């Protein structure tokens, strides 16, 4: 459950390390984002020489949340951190690698490129 001012780890190799959620996209008064939702975020921490710099405003898709996600079969999945992957306007990842596991719910939202790059899909 991601909302404004939430800080997230970055799960790709764009050079950003931490993001701050500015806005949850989808509806005029939408408050929370979960796995597979797109957010607008500011880069708060970045490595030198990366694709994105500190202070850049980017779009990102949430790939892991600490809030448990209920699945249709009744099971829940929860991760140890909140993480997002920076995407471009075509909803493809800006980076070339994805770090850490991602949730299966991304497949339903048509983020197939992220699914294929991820080392593990839970």
UniProtKB/Swiss-Prot annotation:
InterPro entries given in the database record: Ribosomal_uL14, Ribosomal_uL14_bac-type, Ribosomal_uL14_CS, Ribosomal_uL14_sf
Q: Name one GO biological process term.
A: translation
GO cellular component terms, alphabetically, are: cytosolic large ribosomal subunit
Q: Which Pfam families match?
A: Ribosomal_L14 (PF00238)
Q: Report the family membership.
A: Belongs to the universal ribosomal protein uL14 family.
**HAMAP family under this entry?**
Ribosomal_uL14
| Protein name, entry field | Large ribosomal subunit protein uL14
- Organism of origin is Heliobacterium modesticaldum (strain ATCC 51547 / Ice1)
Q: What is the lineage of its organism?
A: Bacteria, Bacillati, Bacillota, Clostridia, Eubacteriales
